[in-house]
Amino acid sequence: MKSAKLFLIINIFLISCQDTDGSSTDYLCEGGYSTADILVNINEEIFNSDESVNAFSKFSWTSNKTSRLLSGNGVPNHEVGTFPNENNPNSIKEQNINQSFTLCPTLVSDTGVSVGGPAGAIAYAINSVKFDPATGGRCNDSGECSMAQGQGNWNIEALGHNTFDFGEDMNHAHVQPTGEYHYHGMPELLIDFLGSSDAMTLVGWASDGFPVYARNGYSDTNDLNSSIIKLRSSYKLKSVPDQGRPSILTVLNGGMGQGTTYPNTSIEMGAFTQDFEYVKGSGDLDECNGRIGVTPEFPNGIYYYVVTDDFPYFSRCLKG
């Protein structure tokens, strides 16, 4: 039984809108947004007694004249699922996270540049756990699939279907072979740790320097006094599968038991990234799951990414 009380707070969680040494307060961004004084004084060390963690979660956010600096060990500061488990054989291990983000993010692409995947992080949460929504799983046209380092044109999604099981927990996260715990979607218990699930909560920073919020935003993008709503992705499930899409899972490598099986089962729509299409204007967000608007931390407005409950769950591209 997992303990309901998981944390021993060692250091006070320091979040400040003022840079303590004044190094970034007077820094002006040219031609872009400024994030210079937002969440740049965080230093936290928490013991997570969850049976799958049993380690300190350590992370700090500071800044210099040009960059936001993250140092952490990638250990979650909240309850997690059981790891290893039947569909994920990996244990959570400390990482060495050192990342920098510009304090002056600028929109440079109208449609976004594809990034991320198992080889890299598209964003980091406040607790130094990375957001990495894609998987290395693929299938070929014959329905021969691998859960990791697969071959073929069809990219397997981690969430939103029952065909493939990557062993995710209640935070839509699991563990890579390196021991790195990472989010594929909504980090539910991190949101609870940071504040109310009904609020607009800043949960991290994207690699291009823009902020990341979870689920909610203002109904009027320009009005801090407007109601908080659940923001909708603009991606839709295709009504007709793409030509050549495999419909039957014939061979599975690295699935349950991590061996080779021959399921001969249907591959439901939504199991592949290619099963979705962007329909401009059908939701609240753009093709990178973001938008421009006011936020509690940026009352004058900024471009921000959103973690959503539906595909793509988190951005697959960056605009900065």
Walk through the language-model features, giving the residues of each.
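Sec-dependent signal peptide recognition
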Residues: 2-9
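C-terminal motif of bacterial Sec signal peptides marking the signal peptidase cleavage site
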Residues: 13-16
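Solvent-exposed N-terminal domain segments of exported/luminal and surface proteins
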Residues: 20-165
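Extracellular structured ligand-interaction cores
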Residues: 96-98, 119-121, 168, 178-182, ...
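Short loop/beta submotifs within extracellular cysteine-rich repeat domains
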Residues: 109, 190-193, 311-316
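Short, flexible domain-boundary/linker segments around small modular repeats
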Residues: 126-172, 258-291
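Extracellular/lumenal glycan-associated surfaces
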Residues: 126-129, 177-190, 298-312
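Extended, compositionally biased non-globular segments
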Residues: 210, 222-320
